Amino acid sequence: MNFAAISHKSTFTDCYALNTDEVIVNLHTGKDVTAVSIIHDDPFAHGCMGHRPWYGTPVAMKPEWELKHNMIWSVKLRPEFKREQYYFSITAGNETVLMFEDGFYTPGEAEKKGRMKQYFKFPWLNSADVITPPDWVNETVWYQIMPDRFCRGSDAPKRFPTRKWSDGKNIHFWDTYGGDLKGITEKLEYLRDLGITGIYMTPIFLSNSNHKYNTFSYETIDPDFGTEEELVALVDKAHSLGIRVMLDAVFNHCGTEFAPWQDAVKNGLESPYWDWFFINQWPLPKLGMKTEDGRYYSFAFGTMMPKLNTNNPEVIAYFQRICSRWVRDWHIDGIRFDVGNEVSHKFLKELGRSLKQVDPDVFLLGEIWHDSSSWLQGDEYDSVMNYPFMESLHNFWLDHQSSWELMYSMNRCLTLYPRQLNNVLFNFLDTHDTMRAVTRCGSVNTFFQQLAVLMTMPGSACIYYGTEIALPGGDDPDCRRPMPWDKIAEGKCDRALRDTKVLIEMRKAYPETRMGEIIWKHDDEKPRFVRYARYVEGSDRVVGVYLNAQETSEKLNLTGKVLFSRNLRGKTLMPGGVAIVLEEPEKWIG
């Protein structure tokens, strides 16, 4: 038995409350393990002083998730008295061991007279400790908008655009196109018809850049984009169309015209805002565009984005007031936290607590590009941007992987966090910080295969503006081209728009596409032919997904309703094709 591959801690993803009645227990093993049971019961089922031996009830665990080198076994328990005490029985071939908190024992060793067994414990299922992200997020299909690049209002004044809207080539970092809040408002019906139920706007507050990530004021809408009244009108209309609104919050750093920063730079240690920042040299050097000399801490060593001290109670209180107003007065439904892994945990806990008092259903999303377990304990972010999903999906095509490797990658993403968080992870194919999906994919066919996976995986799916029409673009700033409304009006994007709409409608109509179990099927002789199904336990249907990443066509045994397809000719799936089919569970289960 490969003991080095076996692990369990009675915390977070290994042992956690799924809801107020159920507890999930997971055990990691190597692939040599053939059976696992959990022996569990209330720790006080046989008294509390040790006069009588404790013994539990064995329950078989299921091999739930297969990774490249490991298996994760899982069981759902329903503790009658909210507590659990447990250990494991693990079998590999003819060898069986018992696993306690302090290690492994043979059955004989475990029962040795005088043995003080160190059981695993789930002490108490407190309702306040259950991770409960907002229910509405799983059902939401998001649309990310960069206001300067999405749409210019029909009667909006031409403030300071430097480029013609029709010119989307050779974009420079400081170019502006003049998009604004009125333009977004005018296109809300377009988004509703696309199937969008949530919009996420990159920053809209006062700044001298087109992206507004160097904020000068957190209370003033940038006049390039409009007014507070226009924002309220946008939110009101969006809500009337069934669309929620999320703002982008830049609290890791600010812009150099932010009044507290200006005061600190001017007055040094005498400034009441000195401790709002991390200034290491004063007066500040006047030369240089980078802070690598340590003059002060900033985002990515850029002088235009000094880092805020989110450990400071005054900074925390300031942003508590700011965000509470956004939610209370503007009826904002969600807040996305830029550079969400660099602000302090204290800041997030206190800010989250105050915002949930204003609106318990407000959605708090962190921008984190890596394993985010530390921020998803239930008292900080509700979710994070799922960059591991985007990267893992892309690697299947980049590295010419097999369907097994795609499964391993998807399973890794789905085992980073508790199950209820998987249903609200913010999934996407591209953002304003990445190469455009269709450009990265190299073909429209591959792009729609990836979009089909996005729309059939657990989480909350997001479309970056223009992704619905397969808008191309390289790395930043080329990924921020203006939305080509003229081409859309001329019908040049009809095929892509139609296919995207079908996928979104399918996701909304069939809940199993965004929650429930994933069943994989593999054929080692056809490693690039991908098959998986989405299934909710007890249902009389599954949603089967077929991707042909081979160089040859594949005959499908289709027996149900085709919900979506590209490059499907009769029952033959051509190379680069995808088919999503409503089928009977018997085809996939058993």
Which residues are covered by each model-predicted region?
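C-terminal beta-strand-rich structural cap/linker in extracellular carbohydrate-active enzymes
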Residues: 569-590
